Amino acid sequence: MKKFLFTALLAVAGFAAQSQSNSVLVYGSLGINSAKTAADVKTNSFSFTPGAGYQFNDHWTGGVNLKTESWKSGSPQIKSSAFSAGPFVRYAYPLSNIFAVFGQLNTNWATGKVAGVKSSGFEGVLFPAIGVNMKNGFALNFNFGSLGITTSKVKGQSGSSTQFGLNFGSGAGFGISKNFGL
């Protein structure tokens, strides 16, 4: 598993947010949240989502993405975690030297644990985004919404669950990327 993750991380390191043929792009986002309700219930969460890929031509990029998340909530404390990894494909359309729009499809194998109960499954997510090219191959990426499906099965139980989601205007994300020319 460690070899797979290392190989995937290296592969993702080759993709760029901007449209630049024969280049490698490395991107990611980080999330840290903490909340406390009036009933003194505390929730803490952490997420890290890196990816890397190769820019085949001025529009198409393919690579590998990873996602790790963890949560702690309540009293007594309930711990949850999730991990997913898989390939992605991105189609980018430059609007100018500064702005580009792109759509990205992530297809991941996923595993998780909530209060000691393990599950595994598959997730597919398609999302639109805007890239703002900065200097030296860096870009700020803003995604806004998603279309996704997730299937999961709890270990030791028969049957599985499926979730479908369409979110536009109700969710947004921010990330950074670096493009390395080859």
Question: How should each PLM-predicted stretch be described?
Answer:
Residues S70-P76, L126-L182:
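Predominantly the C-terminal beta-signal and adjacent terminal strand-loop region
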Residues M1-S23, G181-L182:
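Cleavable N-terminal export/targeting peptides
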Residues V24, H59-G62, N97-F99, V132, ...:
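Repeated loop/turn-to-beta-strand initiation elements of outer-membrane beta-barrel proteins
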Residues Q18-N65, E69-W71, K113, N167-L182:
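Short glycine/proline- and aromatic-enriched beta-strand/turn motifs that initiate or cap beta-hairpins
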Residues V24-G28, G62-V64, A85, V101-L105, ...:
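Transmembrane beta-strands of outer-membrane beta-barrel proteins
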Residues F46-P50, F83-P87, F122-P128, S170-F174:
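Hydrophobic, lipid-facing positions within transmembrane beta-strands of outer-membrane proteins
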Residues G31-A39, K67-P76, P94-S96, N108-G116, ...:
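Sequence/structural signature of outer-membrane beta-barrel proteins
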